[in-house]
Amino acid sequence: MSEFKSDFLHTLSERGFIHQTSDDAGLDQLFRTETVTAYIGFDPTAASLHAGGLIQIMMLHWLQATGHRPISLMGGGTGMVGDPSFKDEARQLMTPETIAANIASIKTVFSNYLRYGDGPKDALMINNADWLLGINYLEFLRDVGRHFSVNRMLSFDSVKMRLEREQSLSFLEFNYMILQAYDFVELYERTGCRLQMGGSDQWGNIVNGIDLGHRMGTPQLYALTSPLLTTASGAKMGKSLSGAVWLNPDMLGPYEFWQYWRNTEDADVARFLKLYTTLPMAEINRLSKLGGSEINEVKKVLATEVTAMLHGRAAAEQAAETARKTFEEGALAENLPSVEVPAPELESGLGLLTLLVRAGLAASNGEARRHVQGGAVRINDDQVSDERRVIGSGDVTGDGVIKLSLGKKKHLLVRPV
């Protein structure tokens, strides 16, 4: 559909969120005439979501901002199975205790983007364990399982890929798409939910839910998927050279999060402003026209706006100021990430390679050695070329810390304790 008339779909379309819908015209009409309830599922595979999942949270944010009701569905039940979609092998099964702990940790992020409550447009957080854990297997087979064609399930790309590669697909995993389809019907029965959204890799699972709803007598249900994003150079969103870009502040602080977005490739800046900030389109269009050295200022705007939504405006501005002092003034910014080292250990002397690994700037002594040999390591802004260098209490500055740097963009403070 060339142009949506409903606020929600128009907003998503102009900002680049829409990859595919099950019925452009029907869904647009639904949003123009009703307050729509829609959901996205989040499986608790880790204690935090990472930046790759932020596009889904932003879709829920815009749903509520345009007057509709979002549901963030926690996969307490489906997480016990694991989504096999486009995976080369089965996920390692998690214990119920791990799943519960991950959900408790994950859900803290959502209130930064959504308003939860009891009102008709307030967001809901629901756990599919509420209905999946109590299912009677024989009744489920009779009432739900009979509506699924194995022939059709085998035709979905996510399944076909595993089979064509002769990679094992367990019966447990094969059931995941049935459970996800059932979630859609159950959410309609409980909340009147008519739309499921997700990444484009979820298309088959979502369409299964629409078909199941049709066979079980629900009104027309709908699907909307977003593109699977990569950076301009082909890297996965939410991954950096240092690892996953976590959303939970106890797993990645505001400064490191800000830096991830500040380091966005030039070709991605305009696209990311549309997807990950709430800046008006007119302002985004203005910023997108800037080039040359001004693109770096636009990247700072991007980093600050994205960080402000997750960590709050004060933390975002503090991260920006820390970066400014570090990179533009060369000053020692007290809000840089830090690692604590026992003072007696420093007094005895700590090997540089060991410190680089402990600080998370290298994964191994071998990698640390390559960084030193490549001239990338500095202590208190002085380049270090000797991999046998020992760091001691004499390296502690008047500020009571040691500044450890890797390249131009990674800095942290070593604090004796």
From Swiss-Prot:
Key word Metal-binding present: no
Motif segment ('HIGH' region): 44-53
Enzyme Commission number(s) from the entry: 6.1.1.1
Molecular-function GO terms, alphabetical: ATP binding; RNA binding; tyrosine-tRNA ligase activity
GO cellular component: cytosol
Domain S4 RNA-binding residues, every copy: 350-417
Positions annotated to bind ATP: 239
Top-level division of the source organism's lineage: Bacteria
Ranges spanned by the short sequence motif 'KMSKS' region, renumbered to the chain: 236-240
Subcellular location as annotated: Cytoplasm
Keywords: Aminoacyl-tRNA synthetase, ATP-binding, Cytoplasm, Ligase, Nucleotide-binding, Protein biosynthesis, RNA-binding
Biological process per Gene Ontology, one example term: tyrosyl-tRNA aminoacylation
Residues engaged in binding L-tyrosine: 39, 176, 180
Gene3D superfamilies: HUPs, RNA-binding S4 domain, Tyrosyl-Transfer RNA Synthetase
Coiled coil stretches, renumbered: none
Catalytic activity of the protein: tRNA(Tyr) + L-tyrosine + ATP = L-tyrosyl-tRNA(Tyr) + AMP + diphosphate + H(+)
Quaternary structure, from the entry: Homodimer.
Family stated for the protein in its record: Belongs to the class-I aminoacyl-tRNA synthetase family. TyrS type 1 subfamily.
Protein role: Catalyzes the attachment of tyrosine to tRNA(Tyr) in a two-step reaction: tyrosine is first activated by ATP to form Tyr-AMP and then transferred to the acceptor end of tRNA(Tyr).
NCBIfam families registered for this protein in UniProt: tyrS
Listed name of the protein: Tyrosine--tRNA ligase
Protein source organism: Rhizobium meliloti (strain 1021) (Ensifer meliloti)
